[in-house]
Design a protein with these regions (language model features):
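RNase H-like (RuvC/DEDD) metal-dependent nuclease/polynucleotide-processing core
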Residues: 2-12, 16-243
Length: 243
């Protein structure tokens, strides 16, 4: 098998936040960048919108990972009349704050969603591998991604409108965005790296994700678009594959 071409650019991993107020966003969102394998940086102090502004300012080629769900379970999308991910993102922009009130099937105190309807297929795969992937409908508890996902989806539409491709709905390009799951990155080892600089869980998740992305950058740079209808509606999570 021919090896993928060598990627010559930067990778950016973002530990996201669903917080509503500015201060909570700026104290939790973290951005990690690896540029040449030896130099890397961590930064914070940005809101969601400002983080997307930062990404838009990155010179191509660039690979960007966000740790929130890019879609909803297919049954919910279809129930809302959505047949494409663009329609899901537009719906989140229009109705997302009402979902977070919450409105069923989103929940804070009691989950009424049957187990078989809580997760996207990629999350079911993660859970089958022993990872505690959360449902987008869950709005409370450690690791919940509901608010961040709902508030992040409209920003994916903005990135796409500005020239980024969003995997798995499109193939990788000079400017690619994809969904990451930092918990899965923690199994990787990075000899010689000073991981003590991660002074918070947010910094750790962004930093380790960026290092993992850099390690697998050549594969990331040639990701192909999904053809499966469910994946094209729900999205997918990129996971590092060890040869």
């Amino acid at each position: 098998m021919t090896a993928p071409p060598r990627f010559r650019g930067e990778v950016v991993a973002i530990d996201w936040s669903g917080a509503k107020d500015r201060r909570a966003q700026t104290t939790t969102i973290r951005v990690a960048v690896v540029r040449d394998g030896s130099s890397w940086e961590l930064s914070g102090g940005r809101t969601r919108e400002e983080t997307v502004d930062y990404v838009l300012g990155c010179e191509p080629p660039v690979l960007v990972g966000f740790d929130f769900s890019f879609g909803v379970p297919a049954w919910f999308a279809r129930e809302q009349g959505c047949t494409t991910i663009d329609e899901v993102w537009a719906l989140a922009a229009r109705d997302g704050e009402a979902w977070l009130a919450p409105a069923s099937p989103f929940w804070r105190t009691r989950c009424d969603v049957p187990l078989e309807r809580r997760y996207r297929r990629c999350e079911e795969r993660l859970r089958a591998q022993g990872f505690p992937a959360k449902s987008i409908f869950q709005l409370v508890g450690n690791g919940q991604v509901g608010a961040g996902s709902v508030r992040g989806m409209p920003l994916l539409a903005r990135l796409r409108a500005e020239g980024f491709t969003v995997w798995p709905f499109e193939a990788a390009s000079e400017r690619t965005v994809f969904e990451i799951y930092p918990t899965a990155m923690r199994v990787e080892r990075f000899p010689g790296r000073d991981l003590t600089r991660f002074t918070s869980p947010h910094a750790r998740d962004a930093g380790i994700s960026a290092l993992a992305m850099w390690r697998h950058r050549n594969t990331l740079a040639v990701l192909e678009a999904a053809t499966d209808p469910v994946t094209r509606l729900e999205g997918d999570v990129w996971l590092p594959v060890t040869d």
